[in-house]
Amino acid sequence: MQLSSSEPCVVILTEKEVEVSVNNHATFTLPKNYLAAFACNNNVIELSTLNHVLITHINRNIINDYLLFLNKNLTCVKPWSRLATPVIACHSRTPEVFRLAANHSKQQPSRPCEAELTRALLFTVLSNFLEQSRFIALLMYILRSSVRDSVCRIIQSDIQHYWNLRIVASSLCLSPSLLKKKLKNENTSYSQIVTECRMRYAVQMLLMDNKNITQVAQLCGYSSTSYFISVFKAFYGLTPLNYLAKQRQKVMW
């Protein structure tokens, strides 16, 4: 029976032994109480039965948030091979949590607290695979959609790092000139993406962590506070302090 989903990733839990085939490749067996994470996009996933399988559907936002939550340097992750079968399996440590996650992943949350509960449950499901060496590479493979998104994920993995075009291009197995060309085709540029990532992070730090401007500048990878302020003003139309005052005023109203 074919496993399908509208989301880019599904994770299954086997309640009995299940035979699996992906893209008509050789069949393999998942024992009872095993988890398997599949990349769904453009892949044909066949299971011997769906009667003894629980399924969670995981969207792009959850995967992206999970990678940020892990706070790993993604430049060190070897890209997933396009020839490899897009699945990773492991023994389930928390089957009861998975059952809750499977139920919640099929529902549309009506309240913010329900959305946060679903997010936490899915993070727990994904964390079962952390000991699998290629798991992060599979998640990055699942998220591939645009070069811009790939660059964003690398920069967001360590905002403070001194990024340059060569380092980012190398981590994507591209030459700097080819990366520039691909980004131009997506109507953006490397410098624009770096600025956007840093400015979004700057706002988070200002609003949530109660840090001063110099601290925020350093956390965003700027050695010069005055330069950080000028970039912030060009991006948001306000200085960091004025932006913060405006946001606090909104809360008061």
From Swiss-Prot:
**Disulfide topology:** none
Name the InterPro entries for this protein.
Homeodomain-like_sf, HTH_AraC, HTH_AraC-typ_CS, Tscrpt_reg_AraC-type_HTH
Asked whether the UniProt record includes Protein transport among its keywords, one would answer no
Q: Which UniProt keywords apply?
A: Activator, DNA-binding, Transcription, Transcription regulation
Q: Which PROSITE patterns match?
A: HTH_ARAC_FAMILY_1 (PS00041), HTH_ARAC_FAMILY_2 (PS01124)
Q: Which Pfam families match?
A: HTH_18
Give coiled-coil spans as residue ranges: none
Q: Which GO terms of the molecular function aspect are on file? A: DNA-binding transcription factor activity; sequence-specific DNA binding
Asked if the keyword Signal belongs to this entry, the reply reads no
Query: Residue ranges of the DNA-binding region?
Result: 166-187, 213-236
Q: Please list the residue ranges annotated as the HTH araC/xylS-type domain.
A: 149-246
Q: Which GO terms describe its biological process?
A: response to temperature stimulus
Q: Name one GO cellular component term.
A: membrane
Q: What does this protein do?
A: Influences the temperature-dependent expression of several E.coli envelope proteins, most notably the porins OmpF and OmpC and the lambda receptor, LamB.
**What is the recorded name of this protein?**
Porin thermoregulatory protein EnvY
User: What species does this protein belong to?
Assistant: Escherichia coli (strain K12)
Q: Identify the taxonomic lineage of the organism of origin.
A: Bacteria, Pseudomonadati, Pseudomonadota, Gammaproteobacteria, Enterobacterales
List the gene name. envY
